[in-house]
Structure formats: C-alpha cells, structure tokens
C-alpha cells in the first residue's frame, strides 16, 4: 500500500518542482475557496471525531486541539490565502560566484521532494502542512491519528479536488487512512521515496521516529516553556505577559508551563500573581519554597511534584518555583526545558543579554510572551512544525525550512584543466 503511495508521491513531486509561483498560488487559492465551500461537510466530520474522542475519555486539552469550529476553519482557509502572499523561496539564488576557471557557480533553493508528516489530534495540521508543501513544490504523505480520521478524510478530499481542478495529480497530497500502527513503521522506512519526516505529537511518537526511521527526522513541538521573572521588573507588565503566556491558549505547545521567580521579589510578587491566576481559574503547582507565600491566596495551590517540571500541562496549570538568581533560573531551564520557547521579564539590559546568550532554545524572548513562537506570528505563514533541534531547521518551520539547495554551474563548453 505505502510503496505505491510513495511512488505516486515521488512522481507528483517532479511535477510540483517545476511549477511557476503563479500556478502554485492558483492551487492554494482554489484550495482555500473549496475549504470554505465544503465547511459544512468538514465540520460534520469533525463532530463525529469529537464525539468518539469524548467517548474514549480524551482530555480537555487534546479535545481543544481536535476541535474545529466555523471560526477556526475560516481562519485556516485565510492562512492558506496568506501562504499565497508569501514569497516563494524556490528558485531563489542564495549566493554565487564567477570562478577563476570561468565557471559561473550559484547555489539555488529547490524543493526537498516528498515530505512525510505523522501527527495526532490536530486536524489543522492537514491543511497547514499541505499548503506549505504545495507552495514549496513538495509532495506530502500525511498520517494523522485515529482521533482525526473523519476530519482528515474530509479535508484531504477537498485538497485533492483543488489539485485536480488545477490540472495537478491528487497524489501530491495523500493521507494514510488506515489506523493500523504497523503502517507507521512502514512509512518510517520508505526512504526510497520520502525525503524528510516530521512527527508532530508526544514524546513517545518522537522517540519512535528517531529510533526506527531510515528517513531524516525533524523533531520538536514538545514545549515545556519557562518564564523567568527577574528582580528588576515592572510587576504589572510582567503579570500581563504571564497571563497571556498561560491563559490565551493553554493547550498550545508554546504556552507557559513553569514560572521561575527571583526570590528577592517573591513576597510582593506572588500574591499579585495568585490574584491574576485565580481570576482565570489557573491552579498553581508550587515548589516548597513558594508554597508558604501562595497558600491562603485566592488561587488554588497544590504542591508541585518533581516530574511536573518535565511535562507539558497543556491546561490551566502552572508550576511556580523561586530561584536565587538568573543563573539558577538558567540551570533549571537547561535541566527541565525542551529547547522550545523560554522568556525573561526584566528591566535590566545586562540580565536580558545574559539570558539570551545562555538559554539554548529555538526561541528566546525578552519581555514578551512565549506564545509568539508560531509561524504566523513570525511572518512565515502557517507552520509545518516547531523544530527544537539544530539540523536542518530550528524554530517555526515555514517555507524556507521545506527547501534544500543545489549547486548549478554555467560554462561555455568549459572543461576542467
């Protein structure tokens, strides 16, 4: 099954690789229009997935990721249109030179070829990934979780109709429909056809892909994100940033999970934090050194467990720990962080610069919410994933991350001497 799917994807990728930007944008425009025109069918399919997920006891955090609403679907269609407006990186000359031999050499961006994406309860990924892959001339094989089966079928059908309407093969965007887990292992070894693999899910999925794949893997998206509140800080501004980072969308991988507070301001800052978090229904998981200052406050407070520092809450829960100084905060982030997104809130330029240099995450913020780690917020359009590794891409993966390059040499019947 996957052998034929891979072969068809590879053949489709050859057609996509030579498309003009105008043609690719036409496909995306038709795709966005069809998503809106078929919204009723897509939302009905999503309702079926939601009902099955609730019946199996899926957590509220994952249910939120699975849910499509009319507003969310409209926003996704608009994201596709935004990809149309982005510059096409394919064909861009990165650098070049005229060599002493007379050879004119240039390094030019080209598509990767075929990209495989494995993901869980995230139906928006189907559309986001397809739009970015098509813009960059890549074919894609999608393997969504069983939780999104009906939604994925409905959206892939719409995407394939858009491709065929524009005279392109439906095999440019394919989905593995079967929930059989053995097919995941088969996909991981489809290196004859698939050029890059991106898993979007939990730590178990990432571990499986790293250990079993014969295809280069880009991992990331697991976000144990921290914010350090420095001794020199504006309380009101800091609380506003913390509120946004934790509350805006707690199920997102860039939401705040652990707050590190300088001990010297804790007696004054933590009561204000408690009031702010209580208003939003956040449960504070307090370290032993923070517990006495939070107990008796308006927020719900429980003692933190050691393992809580290493896991994503993805909910209205927040770890709170006091640290002696910025270096202790950095040590904690190095020990428990996932290299996703971490922030410092401070009025000290020297502290900010020290934090930025020392924290080795894909996105580091000064006086800003970790929620900004997002392809759209970065001006990249919808993202394929957020990479927390250093090769071949890092941070939100937009269009450039879905390309590689080739060397092209021009000569006049030139031979090497």
From Swiss-Prot:
EC number: 1.2.1.41
Compartment list: Cytoplasm
Gene of this entry: proA
UniProt GO cellular component terms: cytoplasm
Cysteines paired by S-S bonds: none
Protein name: Gamma-glutamyl phosphate reductase
PANTHER family on file: DELTA-1-PYRROLINE-5-CARBOXYLATE SYNTHASE (PTHR11063:SF8), GLUTAMATE SEMIALDEHYDE DEHYDROGENASE (PTHR11063)
SUPFAM superfamilies per record: ALDH-like
Task performed by this protein: Catalyzes the NADPH-dependent reduction of L-glutamate 5-phosphate into L-glutamate 5-semialdehyde and phosphate. The product spontaneously undergoes cyclization to form 1-pyrroline-5-carboxylate.
Domain of life of the native organism: Bacteria
Listed GO biological process terms: L-proline biosynthetic process
Reaction(s) catalysed (UniProt annotation): L-glutamate 5-semialdehyde + phosphate + NADP(+) = L-glutamyl 5-phosphate + NADPH + H(+)
The keyword rRNA-binding is assigned to this record: no
Organism: Serratia marcescens
Pathway recorded for this protein: Amino-acid biosynthesis; L-proline biosynthesis; L-glutamate 5-semialdehyde from L-glutamate: step 2/2
Top-tier EC class: oxidoreductase
Family: Belongs to the gamma-glutamyl phosphate reductase family.
Keywords of this entry: Amino-acid biosynthesis, Cytoplasm, NADP, Oxidoreductase, Proline biosynthesis
């Amino acid at each position: 099954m996957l052998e034929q799917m891979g072969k068809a994807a590879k053949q489709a990728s050859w057609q996509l690789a030579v498309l003009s930007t105008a043609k690719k944008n036409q496909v995306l425009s038709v795709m966005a229009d069809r998503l809106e025109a078929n919204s009723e069918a897509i939302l009905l399919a999503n309702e079926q997935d939601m009902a099955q997920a609730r019946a199996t006891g899926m957590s509220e955090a994952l249910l939120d990721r699975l849910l499509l609403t009319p507003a969310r679907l409209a926003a996704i269609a608009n994201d596709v249109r935004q990809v149309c407006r982005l510059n096409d990186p394919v064909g861009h000359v990165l650098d070049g030179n005229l060599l002493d031999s007379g050879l004119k050499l240039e390094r030019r961006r080209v598509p990767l070829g075929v990209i495989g994406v494995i993901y869980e309860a995230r139906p928006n990924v189907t559309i986001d990934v397809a739009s970015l892959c098509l813009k960059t001339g890549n074919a894609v094989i999608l393997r969504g979780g069983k939780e999104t089966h009906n939604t994925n079928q409905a959206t892939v059908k719409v995407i394939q109709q858009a491709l065929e309407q524009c005279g392109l093969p439906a095999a440019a965007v394919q989905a593995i429909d079967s929930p059989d887990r053995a097919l995941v292992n088969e996909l991981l070894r489809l290196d004859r056809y698939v050029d890059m693999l991106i898993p979007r899910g939990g730590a178990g999925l990432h571990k499986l892909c790293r250990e079993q794949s014969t295809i280069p893997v880009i991992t990331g998206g697991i976000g144990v994100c921290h914010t350090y509140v420095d001794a020199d800080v504006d309380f009101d501004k800091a609380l506003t940033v913390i509120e946004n980072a934790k509350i805006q969308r707690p199920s997102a991988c860039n939401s705040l999970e652990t707050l590190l507070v300088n001990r010297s301001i804790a007696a004054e800052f933590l009561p204000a934090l408690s009031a702010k978090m209580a208003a939003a229904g956040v449960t504070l998981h307090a370290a032993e050194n923070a517990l006495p200052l939070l107990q008796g406050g308006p927020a719900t407070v429980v003692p933190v467990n050691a393992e809580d520092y290493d896991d994503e809450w993805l909910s209205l829960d927040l770890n709170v720990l006091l640290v002696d100084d910025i270096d202790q905060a950095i040590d904690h982030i190095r020990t428990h962080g996932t290299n996703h997104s971490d922030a410092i809130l401070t009025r000290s330029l020297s502290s900010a610069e020290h934090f930025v240099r020392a924290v080795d995450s894909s996105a580091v913020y000064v006086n800003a919410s970790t929620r900004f780690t997002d392809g759209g917020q970065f001006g990249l359009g919808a993202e394929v994933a957020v990479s927390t590794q250093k090769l071949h891409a890092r941070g939100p993966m937009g269009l450039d991350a879905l390309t590689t390059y080739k060397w092209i040499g021009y000569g006049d019947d030139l031979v090497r001497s």
